[in-house]
Amino acid sequence: NADKFDNGSEFSWGVFYENGSGNYRTYNSFNNEFFRGDGSMVYNGGGIAARYENKNGVYTEGSLRAGMLKNELDNAMRDVNGSYGYETESAYYGAHIGVGKIISLSDSSDLDIYGKFFHTYTEGDSVTIAGDKFDFDSITSDRLRVGARITSNKENKFSTYYGLAYEYEFNGDADMTAQGLRADTQSLQGSSVMAEVGFNYQPTPDSPW
């Protein structure tokens, strides 16, 4: 939904559904033998997003979201009796705020320069593996992302975009206890660089999304 004002600014908002999946591998050793674990993650959720843009292309945006995250890992651990896997399911909650500016490059393309801050909280879970209890603590993620994105073919319903961004994770610590004994903390804290290429479908020229 979008509302345009007499001063040339625009406010838009909407509700959304989100879904994603990914795969990963772990590498461990037991009794001088190395073994690989294969994992997968799936999340489903939804939320609400809003954005305000003035006539000069400067905008602010924000969102709230919540959902469920499922994680499955095969061959996660091994002992003399064989290998073991586990499954976890946790709720997640998140929010983000952002600011940016849209710069017109031509009639059919523009440049989006932005900065965004993301906060996500994922609840912990407990599993039993081979009779032993493992407790996974909750995880808090705080990320700052700055980047730029170019969108071309804006005059068409299908436009293309590509961009680069730098991201820094301020938190991301993951703690676990096994039978009451605390394991070493695993952390995602640090810098990363990302690139993106994609397509966007805009059903009408006046659509805000």
Name every feature range the model reports, one short phrase each.
Residues 1-209:
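Membrane translocator/pore-forming domains, dominated by Gram-negative outer-membrane beta-barrels
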